[in-house]
Amino acid sequence: MIRYHLKELIAEKEFEERRRITIGEIAKETGINRMTLSKIINHPGHSTVTDNLDKLCYYFDCEIEQLVTHVKEANDESAPLAD
């Protein structure tokens, strides 16, 4: 499963800039729909297009590894099959 670190990146940016950052602001700056951002934040494993990931990396000035990580699950169907 893919895990997004969007909440953490928002918190870091809020701390650095000493102001509140809303989903609406991120949506406006990135062009990503508010509903999509909400799903990324609130629904673990939500699938989104790579263009959105690119826009978020640009907005937060971060590498992809800071935005997403892969979390192995015991019943992970996306894991490669053994020979």
Which functions belong to the PLM regions below?
Residues G31-T48:
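Recognition helix of helix-turn-helix/homeodomain-like DNA-binding domains
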Residues D51-Q66:
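DNA major-groove recognition helix of helix-turn-helix/homeodomain DNA-binding modules
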Residues V68-D83:
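Short, charged recognition helix plus adjacent turn
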